[in-house]
Amino acid sequence: MKIGKVERYIHEKLEKKRLHFVLIDPDDTSPEVAGKLARVCEELEIDAIMVGGSTGAEGETLDEVVKAIKENYSLPVILFPGSHGGISKYADAIFFMSLLNSRNPFFITGAQALGAFRVKKYNLEPIPMAYIIVEPGETAGWVGDAKPIPRHKPKIAAAYALAGQYLGMRLVYLEAGSGAPQPVPETMVATVKKAIDVPLIVGGGIRSGEQVRKLVKAGADIIVTGTAIESAGSIEEARKKLEDLRRGVSI
């Protein structure tokens, strides 16, 4: 499968710097607020916006949020589906991911099979990604019936990541879970990064620029933040939080 426009954009930007993606969950964010957040992301030059969530927003709810983001943001909007329903024709691309450490084959290949023809019909760019849940896993781990990687076992995470690469996945995502008390451990990030040759995404539990700085220093290529922005009391507060997180990427 050829590398598409959005994936090429990611690789070209990674040649120059580490990246920061913002995750917006349509279950928790109205189209109006999503549009305002997207405008802030545009002004701060956030590298991409991901749209999705573990509880599976879909249909008109998802479409309206994606459209509001697209109206206010010129860079890629990438779907991050919790299941096969989380697909919108208005996005630029989709992380076509497999939850490698799920106990349930539905989240490894089942949901992907159910969603594949819709991705093709909408002419969405699929970006193959290995998705790995790390303790505590939070809602993503519970919904995805994952067997979370123990935080003190970085080699297990590295084994899954390398397996994902060998299966043809072109990105690896280490997920501690939205709202996790702590991010993925730096030692795990470093161990995984040494094992693989594809870009490494890290998300979940990231609340400060200092945490971002440490994760980037450990080897994260792309940092994903979501809950930290969604929980802000106002758009201006969200802007300040994003500015702090953004500074951590620029080490």
Curated annotation (Swiss-Prot):
Which terms under GO biological process does the entry name? glycerophospholipid biosynthetic process
The alphabetical list of record keywords is: Cytoplasm, Lipid biosynthesis, Lipid metabolism, Magnesium, Metal-binding, Phospholipid biosynthesis, Phospholipid metabolism, Transferase
Report the sequence similarity comment from the record: Belongs to the GGGP/HepGP synthase family. Group II subfamily.
Question: What compartments host this protein?
Answer: Cytoplasm
Might you give the EC number(s) for this enzyme?
2.5.1.41
Identify one Pfam family in the record: PcrB
The reactions it catalyses are: sn-glycerol 1-phosphate + (2E,6E,10E)-geranylgeranyl diphosphate = sn-3-O-(geranylgeranyl)glycerol 1-phosphate + diphosphate
Q: What does this protein do?
A: Prenyltransferase that catalyzes the transfer of the geranylgeranyl moiety of geranylgeranyl diphosphate (GGPP) to the C3 hydroxyl of sn-glycerol-1-phosphate (G1P). This reaction is the first ether-bond-formation step in the biosynthesis of archaeal membrane lipids.
The cofactors required by this protein are: Mg(2+)
InterPro entries tied to this protein: GGGP/HepGP_synthase_sf, GGGP_HepGP_synthase, GGGP_synth, IGPS_HisA/HisF
Single GO molecular function? magnesium ion binding
- Pathway(s) this gene product operates in, as recorded in its UniProt entry: Membrane lipid metabolism; glycerophospholipid metabolism
Q: Does the keyword tRNA processing apply?
A: no
What name goes with this protein? Geranylgeranylglyceryl phosphate synthase
Recorded GO CC terms: cytoplasm
Binding-site residues, Mg(2+)? D25, S54
| Organism domain of life | Archaea
